[in-house]
Curated annotation (Swiss-Prot):
This is TSET complex member tstE. Residues 1252-1275 have a biased composition (Acidic residues). The gene is tstE. Keywords: Repeat, WD repeat. WD repeats lie at residues 208-246, 250-294, 345-384, 397-436.
């Protein structure tokens, strides 16, 4: 039995292109929205008022060439008239013009005006519907609506135009069905008022969007669907599930019908033909998208919709008929000089047309049941079926009001069906007895038939009908040649399309509160392939929420619908696809394939797979597929359709290939047609044909490093194990399994865990164990360990295990297991303890039984596939899965992953009865998943940072990283790989081009790339600063930018980038910071300039005094500033060695270490986060008898800075808690210091081991000075030395307040700031006496 299922789903954006404005999605502007439109709106209302007053006075105005109002049959001409009343009126493009039409109607249109006819009581009414528009007022799609419109009602479907009449405004909704007559309209009902245009307009705006396709059709040969919406035709590739092309027509027209004209040679190529609502025919070449010709209708005022159409098979000729028409219009595109003509002969309107698939025969049927056969060579009718006296149920044919005609794909017979269900099947129409009825009967009794099509391969036809319950059904019917009747086919059960909610792809928050029901009205089937779709139409009971004018404030219009969704169906060969199908061998990648340089790009030589008939191989390097065994492995002569006598139907389920011994194992289901029984069997065969073993078995697996094979018996209670060798397969040994086992899976674990069993009876996964417990040396390790001594994983009662994959790392001796079930994916350790898992989403709409389809280990990242995406997940359970790429086809089974693409097995959409596997590849980017997986390892799998860095460098060098997400960059910065993160982000040219200067600045700032950050910051600052008359938003942005610049300048100072900091503070006019930097750089010119500016301002006396003190300094020393460093090796203090100190975020003046007089060694653990030096952690101090410098260099040094300008700046600018009491710069001790530590100090006082006395800087990732402010202010700072000036010693040794630094004026190499600090400290002693001095810790 076959089954109908969804094979693809097309989703197209419901948005208007920028190049045109379609009337079907006109913006309905309700109110005075734009200030610049007030005058235009006022002018329009004046014109409407004038026309309304003149409506009863200008019924028959004379024709005029240059008048303002034209009436009668002539109307006004296009050159002069502004308003046309009656037929024929026109107008300039910049004015309001009436469109053409007959009668006394008034038409107000945009541009050339709306078309249609109407009476003198309608404005823009009639066939085509008029439009009111204003060119130059936000395009030609602006519409004014009256306020007094309570609701909108409908009698048909979604619409496309808005027109104005005497009772208000109507929104016209055009029919999507070819069987429904003229388009209906949604009337915006309002009471008749004296002036419908004088009301105040509310201030609201809505978009009228289409939510269904106007028409659909398939390519004659390729798997391509053409879908029309508004004036667009979208080309949708069913295999790749993507839109591959788009065509446009005039924006004022709407496409209503599509049909393809198949060609059989270069002279007669395939054409795509479109009928518009206005009656124009467009012809394209779909391969080149070139417009071939445009054909206008015979009568310009004929606005009737097309009811039926058909195309010649091998000639570009189209036949169609319009509503209530008795003629067939013929358009021959082959003869370019010919005009459309008509075939006449029917007495009643034509109901159906069908062309013979191979011959020049056309069949047509009218509403009175008359069937005529035409010869298209001479356009003459040679058969007329009017007499049904020989048929006993002739009277029933008269009860049908509509008929359907369909030819069998080869032309063997013609099916004629009435809407009542009576069906007549005529044989060969060119035979001697063409009127012979070879079969007849009633179909779909008690139902209303909507559409009939014939399957392109199977001998059956599909009927779409509406059942008594009101739901649509799709049934299949075939001819019983023995009894000459028409019976329902047992091959395909009745299918009820699940399309009543075509907006199911939207979330519940995006849907309108009330949704119209979407009904299928016709079947659209592929001419040669196994695809079909359903043309949809909205039901007649559309509520007011479809209106652009919602009934209440909580209702949502259809402007929220931004996509159109359409399902494409196919007929599968089986009820469901087995999860292990397609049958392709797995090539797992060893650990380190991408991480280690020597393993990268070692491509596998070939991939072996079973295509359903042959064993083949796929070469990844060139994409060539070849047969490995010439003889077919599996042949289904019954074609899967239940015929063929005693033949068997086979379906492969599992395929394994052993590369070492060049043999494969195949598990397949064999269905006996004669016995009506199904068995599961196995086949073991080598490529040379020397080994060929078959038998009964439900599952198999290679175990013991692929040296053995285990076959699971049919009942799941027997395991048959054989040893493999180059000579063949040994005899099988049988082992009893208790309880019943469902499937078996291999493991890389040693010892007893050689097999992993899935027991559905117990709903668990268990390992095997040794049968002979008394003899561990025995290798019979196949007993089920139901007690769980080795580990057990309990599953849900209805959970089924499909696939298990292992990843083993010899470096960390870890084994990780990934388990794929029908409900979730589980990652466990070697004892089946869950590390991470993801569940399938609730109520997922999939044709297969499982949401997940396959899994594959890529280093420490697990890749898995769904029906739409390739995803990845890591070993951290707090990270959500992320997509890698979309999948064009489904379902697929991953075979292997290469650095630039993935290779997978895929079952193509084939003719029913065939089961075929193909191997394909798809380009993907795997850099992100590799990096995230490596940086998201759990605690029990840890690598050294140097190894991680080498792995990351190898990945980046070998793989493409032109596209990488922000999540990866943040993860790298989080793990201190800032340099790598910035280099990646800087090389992403595509991504960089889309970022603003502010975003680039933030990215460089985060990555500690100060020069690049300053460059981008300057660009953004210059851009905003030149804006004249900025608004409030721009002012807020500028203030925020200044804050970022201030913080960035401070950080540049902390990192030693003084020139960059100076550039920032110059833009901000931060004079104190500029003076600080100038003194640090010994830049006297800058100090003079700062002083001059301060004198002009006259508001900063402290700054002036500081400048004077510095400039009055007589001794001028050379500039010698040692920037902050990460590491200070063991050193001897000299007269030329200066060290910078940090207070909060500000670095103070460098100090010479020889100026320190005394120090205090602290004997307790010291923390830089202490509130002050008088805290409890600093009470145990030794007397200051030790002289500076220390002899062993094994202590950190804590000093307090003198009262310098820097301390003044730090205190003055400390408004955001930038200052801490103590900070530290580290130094690495020498090996001699470490050796003497245990002898000099007692480590027991610090509650730690000797190896933890000093900081280990081996893990520092960056060599730049950006990490200078990363201190060791924690409990690991075991011993520190506090310095206290001798002149300020108090009786209490724990009270440390300040430090005196001696000046050495004779030392010209000493930094000038050391001396300046002492002099400036005397400048404002009175000002600073009440200011607490920050304490700075220097760790040498």
């Amino acid at each position: 039995m076959l089954k109908i299922g969804i094979c693809s789903s097309i989703t197209i954006s419901n948005s208007i292109s920028n190049s045109y404005h379609s009337p079907s999605t006109s913006t309905v502007v309700v109110g005075n929205q734009l200030q610049q439109q007030q005058q235009q709106q006022q002018y329009v209302q004046q014109q409407l008022q004038y026309q309304y007053d003149s409506l009863n006075q200008s019924q028959t105005s004379p024709n005029s060439n240059d008048g303002n109002i034209g009436g009668g049959s002539g109307g006004g001409n296009n050159a002069g008239s502004n308003i046309g009343i009656g037929g024929g009126g026109g107008g300039n493009n910049n004015n309001i013009g009436g469109g053409g039409g007959s009668g006394g109607g008034v038409n107000i249109g945009s541009g050339s005006g709306g078309g249609g006819s109407g009476s003198n009581s309608n404005i823009g009414g009639g066939g085509g519907g008029g439009q009111l528009g204003m060119n130059g007022m936000n395009g030609s799609n602006m519409l004014l609506i009256n306020q007094n419109i309570p609701t909108i009602k409908s009698t048909d479907s979604i619409g496309s135009t808005v027109s104005i009449n005497s009772t208000g405004v109507s929104l016209q909704y055009n029919s999507l069905s070819s069987t429904i007559g003229s388009p209906s309209s949604l009337s915006l009902l309002s009471p008749i008022i004296s002036n419908p245009f004088s009301s105040t307009l509310p201030n609201q705006s809505y978009m009228v969007n289409q939510i269904l396709f106007n028409c659909l059709c398939f390519h004659p040969k390729s798997p391509i669907l053409y879908a029309a919406i508004r004036n667009e035709v979208h080309f949708y590739d069913i295999i790749t599930k993507s839109v591959i092309g788009k065509l446009f027509i005039d924006p004022t027209e709407t496409i209503r019908h599509l049909i393809t004209l198949p060609g059989n040679s270069i002279q007669t190529p395939t054409f795509l033909l479109a009928f518009t609502q206005e009656g124009v025919i467009y012809l394209w070449d779909p391969e080149t998208h070139k417009l071939q010709t445009i054909v206008h209708q015979l009568k310009l005022d004929d606005k009737r919709p097309i009811t039926c159409k058909s195309a010649a098979p091998n000639k570009p000729v189209i036949f169609f008929s319009k509503n209530e028409s008795k003629d067939i219009v013929v358009v021959d595109f082959h003869n370019k000089g010919s005009s459309p003509f008509k075939l006449k002969g029917h007495k009643k309107p034509i109901s159906a047309i069908a062309h013979h698939p191979a011959k020049t025969i056309l069949a047509s049927c009218s509403t009175d049941g008359q069937l005529k056969i035409w010869d298209t060579r001479n356009n003459m009718s040679f058969l007329n079926f009017e007499e049904f006296s020989s048929y006993e149920n002739t009277r029933n044919i008269e009860h049908s009001n509509h008929y359907f005609l369909v030819f069998e794909p080869t032309g063997k017979y013609l099916v004629m069906t009435g809407s009542s269900g009576l069906t007549l099947v005529y044989g060969d129409l060119t035979s001697q007895n063409p009127q012979e009825v070879i079969a007849n009967g009633f179909i779909c009794k008690g139902q209303n038939i909507l559409s009939i099509v014939h399957h392109p391969q199977l001998p059956l036809f599909f009927v779409l009908s509406i059942g008594p319950s009101g739901y649509e059904e799709l049934s299949s019917w075939e001819i019983n040649n023995q009894y000459k009747t028409i019976v329902q086919s047992p091959l395909i059960p009745t299918f009820i399309p699940e399309i009543n909610d075509s907006l199911s792809y939207l979330s519940k928050y995006s849907k309108p509160l009330t949704i119209p029901k979407f009904n299928p009205v016709s079947i659209v089937i592929h001419p040669t392939k196994n695809y079909f779709s359903l043309q949809l139409e909205a039901s007649s009971n559309i509520s007011s929420t479809i209106s652009p004018y919602p009934s209440n404030i909580n209702s949502q219009p259809f402007s929220s619908i931004r996509h159109i969704n359409q399902n494409i169906y196919s007929i599968n060969s089986y009820d469901h696809l087995n999860h292990s199908f397609p049958l392709v061998s797995k090539l797992p990648l060893p650990m380190g394939f991408f991480f280690e340089p020597e393993n990268t790009f070692n491509y596998p030589s070939e991939i072996t797979f079973f295509d359903g008939t042959y064993v083949k191989s796929y070469l990844p390097l060139n994409g060539i597929t070849k047969k490995l065994i010439d003889t077919p492995i599996m042949v289904n002569s019954a074609s899967g359709m239940g015929s063929g006598g005693g033949e068997d139907i086979s379906k492969g389920k599992k395929f394994l290939f052993n590369n070492e011994f060049q043999l494969f194992a195949l598990i397949y289901d064999s269905f006996s047609v004669a016995a009506q029984a199904q068995l599961s069997k196995y086949l073991i065969m080598d490529l040379q044909g020397l080994v060929n073993q078959q038998g009964d078995g439900s599952d198999c697996v290679f175990i013991g490093n692929n040296q053995q094979i285990l076959i699971l018996g049919l009942d799941g209670k027997l395991a048959k194990v054989a040893t493999l060798s180059k000579q063949g397969v040994s005899s099988f040994k049988n082992f009893t399994l208790v309880p019943r086992i469902t499937s078996v899976h291999s493991t890389p674990l040693g010892g007893n865990k050689v097999v992993l069993y899935f027991c559905q009876e117990k709903s668990c996964l268990v390992f095997s164990k040794n049968v002979n417990q008394s003899d561990p040396s025995c290798k019979d390790n196949y007993m089920v360990d139901i007690d769980g001594d080795n580990g057990i994983l309990q599953l849900q009662p209805n959970e089924k295990v499909f696939q298990i994959e292992w990843q083993s790392d010899p470096k960390s001796s870890q084994h990780i297991c990934a388990i794929l079930t029908n409900q979730r994916i589980i990652i466990t350790n070697s004892r089946l303890r869950i590390i991470n898992q993801i569940h399938s989403p609730p109520n997922h709409h999939q044709s297969t039984s499982s949401y997940f389809q396959s899994i594959f280990w890529l280093e420490w990242t697990l890749l898995y596939t769904t029906s739409t995406h390739l995803m990845y997940m890591t070993l951290q359970n707090n990270q959500a899965p992320k997509p890698i790429s979309t999948l064009s086809i489904s379902p697929i089974i991953l075979s292997t992953i290469l650095p630039d693409r993935m290779i997978f097995g895929y079952q193509g959409l084939q003719v029913p009865g065939k089961n075929e596997t193909t191997v394909r590849c798809q380009a993907i980017g795997i850099l992100e998943c590799l990096i995230i997986g490596l940086l998201s390892l759990p605690p029990f799998i840890q690598y050294e940072k140097k190894y991680l860095s080498s792995c990351l460098q190898n990945i980046v060098q070998k793989l493409d990283y032109t596209r990488i997400s922000k999540h990866v960059l943040d993860k790298l910065r989080e793990r201190s790989f800032t340099d790598l993160a910035y280099s990646l982000s800087n090389d992403m040219k595509i991504s960089q081009s889309k970022q603003s200067s502010l975003e680039k600045f933030r990215m460089a700032w985060i990555s500690k790339q100060y020069e690049a950050a300053n460059r981008h910051l300057s660009i953004e600052f210059n851009r905003i600063s030149i804006i004249k008359n900025p608004n409030d938003t721009e002012k807020r942005q500028f203030n925020k930018l200044k804050e970022n610049m201030r913080d960035f300048g401070r950080e540049c100072m902390n990192a030693g980038h003084y020139l960059l900091a100076k550039d920032c503070f110059q833009k901000l006019s931060e004079h104190i910071y500029l003076l600080q930097i100038s003194i640090l750089l010994n830049d006297r010119d800058s100090v003079i300039a700062i002083k001059r500016d301060a004198e002009l301002r006259g508001d900063d006396h402290v700054l002036l005094a500081a400048c004077d003190k510095y400039l009055n300094k007589q001794n001028k020393s050379i500039n010698k500033v040692n920037p902050p460093v990460v590491k200070i090796l063991p050193w001897d203090p000299t007269a030329t060695t200066n060290v910078s100190m940090k207070s909060g975020l500000d670095y103070l003046s460098p100090i010479n270490l020889n100026s320190i007089q005394r120090y205090y060694p602290i004997s307790l653990p010291f923390s830089g986060a202490s509130a002050s030096l008088n805290g409890g952690k600093h009470k145990l101090l030794r007397p200051p008898e030790e002289s500076w410098p220390p002899e062993d260099f094994k202590h950190s040094v804590a000093i307090t800075p003198p009262r310098t300008l820097m301390s003044l700046v730090a205190n003055r600018l400390s408004t955001k808690s930038h200052m801490s009491s103590t900070t530290t710069l580290r130094r690495s001790p020498s090996i001699e210091n470490i050796r003497t530590t245990s002898t000099t100090f007692d480590s027991s006082k610090f509650n730690t081991d000797n190896q933890e006395l000093f900081d280990d800087d081996s893990d520092d990732d960056s060599d730049s000075g950006a990490d200078a402010d990363v201190d060791s202010e924690n409990e690991e700072d075991r011993k520190l030395v506090m310095t206290v000036p001798a002149s300020l010693q108090h009786n209490d040794n724990s009270s440390l307040t300040n430090i005196t630094v001696t000046d050495n004026d004779s030392n010209l190499d000493q930094d000038i700031t050391s001396n300046t600090g002492s002099d400036i400290a005397d400048l404002n002693d009175t000002q600073l006496s009440s200011t607490p001095t920050p304490t700075t810790t220097l760790s040498s």
